[in-house]
Amino acid sequence: FHRQPLLRELKEMNSILEMLEHTEVVMIAGNHDYIKKNSYYRTFSWASHVHMICSQEIDCVELDRIQTAVYGCSYHSREIHDPVYDHAVPEGRQKYEILLAHGGDEKHIPIKSNQIMTLGYDYVAFGHIHKPQLLVENRMAYAGSLEPTDTGDIGRHGYIEGRITGKGCQIRFVPHALREYRNCEVKVDKSVTGHVLRQKITDMIAEQGMQHMYKITLTGYRDPDIWYELDHMDSY
């Protein structure tokens, strides 16, 4: 959640996750939905296959059916300045071991990718940054948010699909969000009238997709006698 969740929202989320029949779900709270004193996370009862790591210290969920241990911790405050993950060594509880982490900047658990890679996890799943980002090939990545949360979240959004076998870990980014925020540039010159500009924008959107949300920047120099009525440029 990008804020403190309401009880009804946890119930809705749990109801959706209950529909998963062959999946184990492991979650932690981040800096926006951190576990404060009266957080509903503290008392909520999740479905049997949904596991919430509420501890502010590194803890572990063991998933015997899939021979996997997931390590992580939840935020109990908006900021954590200590590099908590630097010494979060896996304990060898299961065949496969994953670190579920949140942060990456100086105010939210600073990280050093090289240091974390020396710990020995099969995979490190990071959250906090909204844009998908590969840190170490097939070993460490930010999945990003499933959907863009504000106009700054440009580009594709989706999830990371991974497979861990005896041969190692393989991951791939799967685009999933139907809509994107896109920043586009339209060049103008003295020959471009308001009508021509509107058609340029219309053609560009038709080519890239009407479902997306656009921020359009005009570059160049217009005829001083021409005035672009920007409120009338939306042709859809």
Q: Model-derived features: where do they sit?
A:
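Short, glycine-rich nucleotide/cofactor-binding loops
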Residues: F1-P5, V188-S191
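Accessory, non-catalytic peripheral segments of nucleic-acid enzymes
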Residues: C169-Y236
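His/Asp/Glu-rich metal-coordinating catalytic cores
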Residues: R3-R163
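Short loop segments at secondary-structure junctions
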Residues: T165-K167
